[in-house]
């Protein structure tokens, strides 16, 4: 269990002490997909969904979620994010929406969880806004795409 940084020698969960770590610029990108029927995607893209602008709402939800990650994930540190960006793209040929989030800060711990939370909550918001139209949408492939900064260095997911 000693390989898990959030577990102490007694096997108890603890927030990692990052006070001695150096501050570095850290950035993370994550993605998620929401698969849906062509008719549902057309409602979103055309802006004719009765609940309003689905992409704008999902974008704001993702940004808000990144800022509250420490409140949602028990052992995450509260972070002073300097950038949160959420982009949504309708891929009509595949009947899905791709969400990509970017989080950045100068700090002592990474922003991977914030980027993953932003993409996840944006996807959940799309589901919430469209569930009256389609209940069998699928959220998939939530993953970290890239992270930079910190002691562990650069990570880039395989394409």
Curated annotation (Swiss-Prot):
| Signal peptide coordinates | none
Task: Give the record's pathway.
Answer: Cofactor biosynthesis; molybdopterin biosynthesis
Q: What class of enzyme is it?
A: lyase
Q: Which domain of life is it from?
A: Bacteria
Q: Which UniProt keywords apply?
A: Lyase, Molybdenum cofactor biosynthesis
Q: Which residues form the active site?
A: 128
Classification via Pfam families:
MoaC
Q: Which GO molecular function annotation, any one, does this entry have?
A: cyclic pyranopterin monophosphate synthase activity
**Annotated positions binding substrate:** 75-77, 113-114
GO biological process entries: Mo-molybdopterin cofactor biosynthetic process
Q: Which reaction does it catalyse?
A: (8S)-3',8-cyclo-7,8-dihydroguanosine 5'-triphosphate = cyclic pyranopterin phosphate + diphosphate
Q: Work out whether the entry's keyword set contains Plastid.
A: no
EC number from the UniProt entry: 4.6.1.17
On assembly, the entry states: Homohexamer; trimer of dimers.
* HAMAP family assigned: MoaC_B
The UniProt function text for this chain reads: Catalyzes the conversion of (8S)-3',8-cyclo-7,8-dihydroguanosine 5'-triphosphate to cyclic pyranopterin monophosphate (cPMP).
Q: What protein family does this chain belong to?
A: Belongs to the MoaC family.
User: Can you name this protein?
Assistant: Cyclic pyranopterin monophosphate synthase
Phylogenetic lineage: Bacteria, Pseudomonadati, Pseudomonadota, Gammaproteobacteria, Vibrionales
Gene name as annotated = moaC
């Amino acid at each position: 269990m000693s390989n898990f940084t959030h577990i102490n020698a007694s096997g108890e969960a603890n927030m990692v002490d990052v006070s001695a770590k150096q501050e570095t610029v850290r950035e993370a990108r994550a993605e998620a997909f929401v698969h849906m029927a062509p008719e549902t995607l057309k409602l979103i893209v055309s802006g004719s969904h009765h609940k309003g602008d689905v992409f704008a709402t999902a974008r704001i939800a993702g940004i808000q979620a990144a800022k509250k990650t420490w409140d949602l994930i028990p052992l995450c540190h509260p972070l002073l994010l300097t950038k949160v960006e959420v982009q949504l793209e309708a891929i009509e040929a595949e009947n899905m929406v791709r969400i990509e989030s970017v989080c950045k800060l100068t700090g002592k711990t990474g922003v991977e969880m914030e980027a993953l939370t932003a993409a996840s909550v944006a996807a959940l918001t799309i589901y919430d806004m469209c569930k009256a139209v389609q209940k069998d949408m699928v959220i998939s492939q939530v993953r970290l795409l890239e992270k930079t900064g910190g002691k562990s260095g650069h990570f880039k997911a395989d394409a």
